[in-house]
Design a protein with these regions (language model features):
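Loop-to-helix entry region of an early transmembrane alpha helix in multi-pass inner-membrane enzymes
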Residues: 66, 70-74, 83-100, 134, ...
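Short acidic/glycine- and proline-prone juxtamembrane loop motifs at membrane-interface regions
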Residues: 68, 130-143, 354-355, 401-402
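Short helix- or helix-capping micro-motifs
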Residues: 25-26, 121-129, 133, 153, ...
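Membrane-lumen/periplasm interface segments of specific transmembrane helices
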Residues: 207-319
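Extracytoplasmic catalytic/substrate-binding loops of multi-pass membrane glycan-assembly enzymes
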Residues: 36-51, 62-75, 84-88, 143, ...
């Protein structure tokens, strides 16, 4: 009871702006969604409802839901039947999930930085075209993303208790019921614990506390998939590979079409060189293009400055340099130059500058980050590690929509907000000091 009273007092003293932003977002999206967007604009919404009906009828073995388990169809058909309107049900799911993400974005960022940075980050979420789009449309994308964000709130807490680890596994599993991508967040978190948790006993204890609730919660889906389809996952990456790989030959495409229901290893061994060429193109150009907008003609982007190419990278990397508190040493400079030279030569020999320039952009930041890793807060460290692991895994396929990268997006507006609020004033101060110093020298 005392804890509840303390929580109420804390809420009263808390800044009301995050709640106000969330409420404004809710009513704007509600108005657009229910008064202007009055038909299924995407086939996915009605597809998941119909798929849910077929599952309830016992016809699941005849369904082909590539890239998604049965949770999405069951959610849509259950709420749709309850309300008597599949369209309204889908709208409610999207609206509540999108509003929840905007609300949580503040509190997750507050786990990382101060309230001002968290508030600006929340504003980036509230005005994001992708968040608004997913909150209005009837799709199966934003509900699993909401549960990922709930898990991220507990993951980024500075002090975690046993219930926190249990809840992380549980909410990632709920997301897994709707989309498989949450397993990447789980893998990243387990790797983070094993690398950065100092006490060996805690490493395994915390990992098991997260892993077991996840496995226990997803076990009905795995069992259903195995009984119905003869495999644990209904994911079909080869389908996306056949449709999306940039570099293809006619013979290769025909072979891929023949193995769309098989695993990635089969696709890899058809032509390893062609597979790797596409993989590194996805990893260093196509997928990051949806994060930062490399070219003028790309409109499907998560860049916080979507009008101009590349510019969205500047505040992100500026925020990263701010948290690492970089003081470049001669050794770091030597390693950086050497790495840049080696990668440049490798790109000239094996790659193309047009598609692999991001390696050269990232190299200095990787060197500085690893050299100053102790200065980076652990929860920020996790989000950076998650970004790397997510991109490495997801780049097996070319993402066809920018919103597929939203599970890792929070760190980008958060670092940008940090740069705008704390980094720029530091730069201004240093410029003033430099001008004053030069003025003093001229006077003498």
């Amino acid at each position: 009871m005392l804890d509840l009273k303390t929580a109420v007092i804390q809420f009263k003293n808390e800044n009301k702006m995050p709640i106000l932003i969330t409420i404004v977002f809710f009513f704007i999206i509600f108005y657009v969604s229910f008064f202007h967007n009055l038909t299924f604009g995407e086939p996915s919404g009605i597809f998941y409802y119909i798929a849910g009906e077929e599952i309830l009828k016992g016809n699941a073995e005849n369904l082909g839901i590539a890239g998604a388990p049965i949770g999405g169809p069951l959610l849509h058909v259950t709420l749709g039947n309850l309300l008597g309107d599949a369209f309204t049900a889908g709208k409610i799911i999207s609206l509540i999930s999108g509003t929840g993400i905007v609300f949580l974005s503040y509190f997750i960022t507050k786990n990382l930085f101060d309230k001002k940075v968290a508030l600006l980050t929340q504003l980036f979420f509230a005005v994001s075209a992708k968040i608004a789009f997913l909150s209005i449309m009837v799709l199966n994308e934003i509900a699993p993303l909401f549960f990922i964000f709930v898990a991220l709130y507990f993951i980024t807490k500075k002090q975690k208790t046993i219930p926190d680890f249990l809840l992380i596994g549980f909410f990632l599993a709920i997301s897994f019921w709707l989309r498989y991508q949450s397993v990447i967040i789980l893998i990243a978190f387990l790797i983070f614990l094993l690398i950065f948790e100092r006490k060996t006993i805690l490493k395994f204890k915390q990992s098991l506390l997260t892993f077991f609730p996840f496995v226990l919660t997803i076990s009905p889906i795995l069992l259903f998939n195995f009984i119905t389809f003869g495999k644990l996952s209904t994911n079909a990456p080869n389908l996306y590979i056949a449709a999306g790989f940039k570099f293809q030959t006619e013979q290769w495409h025909e072979k891929i079409e023949g193995i769309v229901n098989e695993g990635l290893i089969s696709a890899f061994f058809i032509d390893p060189n062609l597979f790797l060429k596409n993989y590194f193109y996805n990893l260093f150009f196509h997928n990051p293009d949806h994060l930062f907008k490399f070219t003028v003609d790309v409109f499907d982007t998560l860049s916080i400055i979507p009008v101009f190419p590349i510019l969205g990278m500047i505040p992100v990397f500026g925020g990263f340099l701010y948290i690492t508190k970089v003081r470049l040493t001669k050794l770091q400079f030597f390693i950086m130059i050497s790495a840049l030279l080696i990668f440049f030569l490798l790109i000239l020999v094996f790659g193309e500058i047009e598609y692999h320039f991001m390696i050269l952009v990232l190299t200095p930041f990787v060197v500085l980050g690893l050299s100053n890793i102790k200065k980076i807060p652990d929860n920020v460290k996790f989000l950076l590690l998650l970004t790397v692991i997510f991109m490495v895994v997801i780049s097996i396929i070319p993402v066809y929509r920018a919103y597929l990268l939203l599970p890792i997006w929070l760190i980008f507006p958060a670092l940008s907000s940090l740069f705008f609020i704390e980094g720029i004033p530091v730069i201004q101060t240093k410029i003033r000091q430099l001008i004053q110093r030069e003025g003093t020298k001229n006077e003498t």
